[in-house]
């Protein structure tokens, strides 16, 4: 029998309608029918996309135009028998590919994490008998038996429930367990409100029941997420795009120069072809910044380590750079912007309204009347004493202190908040005994206990105010009982709801003498309201500061929550979120087309009653407006939005493994302040990357110009390919790390985010690298022209030129460390990295100039001390010229920023 799509959602159908539409019965399917449906629907498993093998992923790192230049150069060296040069050039290409391969993040892990969430076996009813079968054999129409601790094997419609509670946090992000029942529901409901459906991958926390399979494999909610994860293409970061463009520009420039010089030298200089090819190989190797990809990867890796120390784990290297360009952060509320510790802030009785101090589970903080800061004390028999004892005893949670000295609760957050409140004031000692209990249930929304309190026997009740208001006939005062005044209580609830407080009521009544059992009819008369507590999940103090820092840095913060709009706006105002005076709901977003959604995404900063699906659309809407978006999440349903965002941010504590795998960054403390800290670090790393690029490229320009001038003049080629590679890989790479350790500029969080389309090689950067490259090349050329007529050997001249270029690079590194201001500032001494790399560079230069085996390998010769002095003075003069250039071009640089 075929099972197609229902005409209306299964959660809107009764049990009988569901069974009828899916062609099943309470006795289950027959074996024959189950086999036929397995053929029709396929196995209950998520579709898998075949990933690329490791060797193909490694080879992909050679797919770069600059690497092509090196590979061709190595090949030509091989044909010409220059084995050492060939191995050195090829080694550089392989090292670059290895670094890229090691740093690469395997996106397939996120899909594998989803597949790992599926259970392996299920108990089903087939032809009236219970059978244990592999979950892969489940088909629509199977009746599945559900027990506490089970992982739901497919999407089910509940047909029988016994105190069935399910943990759906992996799917919805909401930490509270969900009470499930078999009743039909009406209207369009978000996933988290479909109380008669069970979803594949979620876990039964208590109770049991049965459900009929309504979707398997790729048709389940988990399957839809799996498909979305497969289909989403991650945006390339601005730096990755720019470096590709830079590489292609360098490649085209090299190609044009080589062709022009080949014909010029062949026609006008009558050079032998073999010598000309060697010269052009030197030119190609000189013009390619071979070390730059590796340098960028390593600088990003250092940024990753710095962020890890600040509790932000970066999973994908380019994220470090993207953080600096982020313009919008969409953040969950609970636990990220707030403490995730529900705390009572107000207690309202018929006599008095109290303020409650304290913002965590630690049982400290005074309770005092709103108009009097004097802390209250509790006396035996007072209204406050009875109220506090009621919320303490009619409560399934416990307040405990762990081994680290931190206070925690067991049980639900609402009960936990009441338990903490009761612990803030010592109650008079009293002998108590619980005799019976009605557990809390979402159907009737209250909990009740039967207690002996000393010589008194009482029934205690806590629950939703609207429910207890219907039960109460009286209200308690310190002077006795009064008739229940509902308008008074409703007015108080409305008043405190505007502050974002969630209300819970407490009541009591005398029990019958000798009563041992408690049932719902016992609560139908004589119930006395004691008071209501207003509670909230308070904002993290550090989140308030972090949001202010983000706003100062030009980054808008948007809060996404499942709360009521009024509550969300209240929390938003406490946090200092920009436009917290208005909110929009998920239902309103669902009704919008793409254009309307794009406008709303920019207009509003508070998004209430939202689902994880809304997050995905919000990311797309903001990106359509050219925003660089950071998005937080913890549930499996958040994973597509995190993968789509420019920076996906997962929670390390409450986040699922799937979400962490999909994310670019994981917060180990689930704290919004960590995001702001990561943005600061991202901006610092980008600044240092730009400084590094400005530092590396002039050296390549200078080397290329020296070779071009030599070819045009018909002179000796001043630098061999291996010497060029030494400068590009050993010298430039070593010195670049000094810039990687530079501290952030003072105004780093006072600037707006950089424009994503602003090229790292902007107008000023092009001027700077050409200016410095020309200056280094001219100084080296003049020195070479001075040395050649004096009869020095080719090895000696090359060694002097090598030392000149290296010394010029060292001084230019000092120029690059400060964008605006004198480079020899006090911060120079604070950056130990610069002095470490300077020491390493000195050791390397001594090695290549004086070690016999290095002289043989690289064709160098020993230098007298005076040439160290000469090259040092040349470098120092260039340093002063660049410092003067920074002053003269300051206005231009500010225009480019």
Where does each model-flagged region fall?
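Conserved cytosolic headpiece of P-type ATPases
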Residues: 1-750, 758-761, 774, 785, ...
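Generic alpha-helical transmembrane segments
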Residues: 730-731, 776-777, 799-813
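Membrane-water interface at loop-to-transmembrane-helix junctions
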Residues: 755-774, 794-800
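A C-terminal functional module that forms or caps the active site or interfaces directly
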Residues: 816
């Amino acid at each position: 029998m075929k099972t197609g799509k229902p005409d209306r959602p299964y959660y809107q159908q009764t049990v009988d309608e569901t069974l009828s539409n899916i062609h099943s019965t309470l006795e289950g399917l027959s074996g024959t029918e189950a086999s036929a449906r397995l053929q029709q629907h396929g196995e209950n498993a998520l579709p898998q996309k075949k990933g690329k093998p490791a060797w193909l992923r490694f080879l992909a790192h050679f797919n770069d135009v600059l690497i092509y230049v090196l590979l061709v150069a190595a090949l030509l060296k091989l044909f010409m028998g220059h084995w050492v040069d060939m191995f050195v050039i090829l080694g550089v290409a392989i090292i670059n590919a290895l670094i890229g391969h090691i740093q690469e993040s395997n996106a397939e892990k996120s899909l594998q994490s989803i597949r790992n969430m599926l259970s392996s076996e299920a108990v089903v009813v087939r032809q009236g008998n219970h059978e244990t079968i592999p979950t892969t054999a489940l088909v629509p129409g199977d009746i599945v038996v559900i027990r506490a601790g089970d992982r739901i094997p497919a999407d089910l419609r509940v047909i029988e429930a016994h105190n069935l509670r399910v943990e759906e946090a992996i799917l919805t992000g909401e930490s509270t367990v969900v009470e499930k029942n078999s009743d039909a529901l009406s209207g369009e409901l978000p996933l988290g409100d479909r109380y008669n459906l069970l979803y594949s991958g979620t876990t039964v926390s208590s109770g049991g029941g049965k459900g009929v399979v309504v979707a398997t494999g790729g048709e389940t909610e988990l399957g839809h997420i799996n498909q979305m994860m497969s289909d989403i293409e991650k945006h390339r970061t601005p730096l990755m795009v720019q470096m590709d463009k830079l590489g292609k520009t360098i490649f085209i420039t090299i190609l044009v120069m080589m062709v022009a010089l080949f014909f010029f030298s062949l026609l006008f200089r009558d050079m032998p072809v073999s010598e000309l090819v060697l010269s052009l190989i030197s030119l190609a190797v000189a013009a390619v910044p071979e070390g730059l990809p590796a340098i960028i990867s390593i600088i990003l890796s250092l940024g990753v380590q710095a962020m890890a120390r600040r509790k932000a784990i970066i999973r994908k290297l380019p994220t470090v750079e993207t953080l600096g360009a982020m313009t919008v952060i969409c953040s969950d509320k609970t636990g990220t912007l707030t403490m995730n510790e529900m705390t009572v802030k107000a207690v309202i009785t018929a006599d008095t309204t109290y303020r409650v101090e304290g913002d965590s589970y630690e049982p400290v903080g005074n309770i005092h009347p709103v108009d009097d800061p004097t802390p209250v004390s509790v006396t035996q028999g007072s209204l406050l004493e009875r109220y506090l004892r009621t919320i303490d005893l009619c409560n399934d949670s416990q307040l405990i202190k762990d081994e680290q000295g931190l206070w925690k609760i067991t049980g639900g957050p609402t009960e936990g908040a009441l338990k903490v409140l009761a612990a803030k004031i010592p109650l008079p000692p009293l002998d108590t005994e619980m005799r019976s209990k009605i557990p809390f249930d979402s159907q009737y929304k209250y909990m009740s206990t039967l207690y002996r309190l000393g010589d008194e026997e009482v029934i205690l009740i806590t629950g939703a105010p609207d429910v207890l208001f219907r039960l109460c006939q009286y209200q308690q005062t310190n002077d006795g009982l009064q008739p229940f005044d509902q308008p008074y209580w409703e007015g108080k609830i409305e008043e405190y709801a505007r502050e974002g407080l969630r209300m819970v009521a407490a009541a009591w009544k005398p029990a019958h003498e000798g009563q041992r059992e408690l049932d719902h009819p016992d609560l139908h008369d004589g119930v006395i309201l004691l008071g209501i507590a207003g509670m909230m999940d308070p904002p993290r103090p550090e989140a308030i500061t972090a949001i202010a820092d983000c706003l100062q840095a030009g980054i808008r913060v948007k809060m996404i929550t499942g709360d009521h709009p009024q509550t969300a706006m209240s929390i938003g105002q406490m946090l200092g979120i920009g436009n917290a005076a208005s909110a929009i709901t998920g239902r309103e977003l669902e009704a919008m087309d793409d254009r309307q959604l794009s406008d709303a995404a920019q207009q509003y900063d508070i998004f209430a009653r939202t689902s994880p699906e809304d997050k995905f659309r919000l990311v797309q809407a903001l990106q359509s407006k050219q925003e660089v978006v950071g998005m937080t999440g913890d549930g499996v349903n958040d994973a597509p939005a995190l993968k789509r965002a420019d920076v996906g941010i997962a929670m390390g504590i409450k986040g699922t493994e799937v979400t962490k795998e999909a994310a670019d960054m994981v917060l180990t403390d689930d704290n919004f302040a960590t995001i702001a800290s990561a943005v600061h670090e991202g901006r610092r790393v980008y600044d240092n990357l730009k400084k590094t690029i400005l530092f590396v490229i002039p050296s390549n320009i200078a080397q290329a110009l020296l070779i071009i001038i030599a070819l045009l003049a018909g002179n000796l080629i001043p630098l061999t390919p291996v010497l060029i590679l030494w400068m590009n890989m050993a010298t430039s790479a070593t010195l670049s790390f000094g810039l990687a350790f530079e501290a952030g500029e003072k105004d780093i969080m006072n600037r707006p985010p950089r424009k994503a389309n602003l090229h790292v090689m902007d107008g000023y950067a092009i001027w700077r690298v050409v200016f410095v490259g020309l200056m280094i090349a001219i100084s080296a050329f003049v020195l070479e022209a001075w040395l050649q007529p004096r009869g020095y050997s080719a090895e000696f001249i090359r060694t002097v030129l090598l030392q000149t270029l290296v010394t010029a690079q060292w001084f230019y590194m000092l120029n690059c460390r400060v964008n605006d201001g004198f480079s020899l500032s006090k911060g120079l001494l604070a950056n130990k990295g610069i002095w470490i790399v300077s020491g390493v560079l000195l050791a390397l230069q001594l090695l290549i100039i004086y070690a016999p085996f290095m002289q043989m390998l690289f064709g160098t010769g020993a230098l007298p001390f005076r040439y160290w002095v000469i090259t040092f003075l040349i470098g120092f003069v260039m340093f002063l010229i660049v410092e003067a250039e920074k002053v003269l071009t300051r206005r231009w640089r500010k225009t480019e920023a």
